[in-house]
Amino acid sequence: MNKLKILDIDLNVARKLGINKVKKYCILPIKEESNKVIVFASKDITDNKEEIEFIFNKKVEIFKVSEEEIEDLIYKSFLGEQENLVEIILSKSIYEIASDIHFEPQREDIIIRIRIDGILVPFAKIKNQEYQKILSQIKVLGNMDITERRKPQDGKAYIKLGDKDYDLRLSTIPIVYGEKLVIRILYGEIFNHDINNLNLSTFQREKLNKMISMKNGLILINGPTGSGKSTTLYSILKEINKNDVNITTLEDPVEVLIKGINQVSLNKKANITFATGLRSILRQDPDILMIGEIRDEETASMAVTASLTGHKVYSTIHTKTPKEVFFRLEDMGVKSYLIKDSLIGIISQRLIKTLCNKCKGIYKEVKINDKFITSYKANGCIYCNYTGYRGRKSVSAVVYIDEKIKILISNIFQEIKELSNEEMILNLRYLIENGFITVDDYNRFLIEEGLNYEKNRIII
């Protein structure tokens, strides 16, 4: 049984026997049909079948599932009956390292989904009256208008679970069947990544070390939304955070707190934008600046100017390839000679989902780069929410803008494209050769990123 079946459960049917009976018998009624009731069970219920048929006044059709699956479904189906529901949902989501929690009103019930590793995973179903209690509690926490249901609202809240503090960003919007609520979880000081987690080759690490050791210049991390740019940026900040430098960041918002670094959040009401904030920070005697994102002409111009006047500047930019970084900066009004003089490195990256170590299975021997390797396939278990995947790895290109590239500045776009494509393919080969990804995902990545599929594909 796939975990997605939680979406098909009729809560009125599932809860009809009560929590004590379903736990005792290791069963869960799923739905009623005209002449029968569908029941999932993890063990023989012959002795209890007659009782269940009497309660429902219908015949019982039994489907066998594993004990861990039935326990998981029972927990998710009866979740809404528990006390401290907000704390339970937040605790479980944080345990799964989820980035967002979605409460989605349907015609009859509320579906809860959580975003893990960039993918929304069905988490539970609760009844509307149970959701209204959650919604009211969250609105109070976020200083939102508890009576307003017709307009979108945004809020912030801070909670403490155990000995850890978490920052929540709250958003409601009216949809057809009620108010949808999304909670974004910011993990603050709980950040376990560093440069060693970035899946860089020895050669890439050497180039990155050169880039971060330079006293001034601009380093940009590029990629689409959700490609891990912020994680890479914070990992670098942890690496360069020393007692003898003044590091100041400007973020929207501050997602990870790092001791010893001065971090500033954008604030529209206080007129702190990327441009105005950067102007003020430059008066604070900074050695190193981190700008969450270069979005407009003024920020781009100031970032380049700062990097040319003795500061080290790190930032992200929304482009797909390293060569597009140059086009984007030029579009923002930065002169090409200033880009050449200021830019010392580009890190271009994507994320690819990795197989669950608990349940992945051997698939077959495949040939890659003139050698045979064992490839693996996704299966699915409770640990990975029955997706077959757990976690993500980055596929990166580290482009060090050295004198060779600066001399060839007239051909820089083609030069950078060739360098970055080659590095991404090497990263990708490492992941397939070490059993992190499937052959299908390997080939799909080549196609999606335009990495010469015909030349580099694995033929099954």
Show which residues each predicted segment covers.
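Polyanionic, low-complexity intrinsically disordered segments
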Residues: 1-54, 154-160, 171
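Long, charged amphipathic helices and adjacent flexible linkers at domain junctions
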Residues: 4-13, 77-83, 456-460
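Short, flexible helix-loop junctions that flank or precede catalytic/ligand sites
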Residues: 83-460
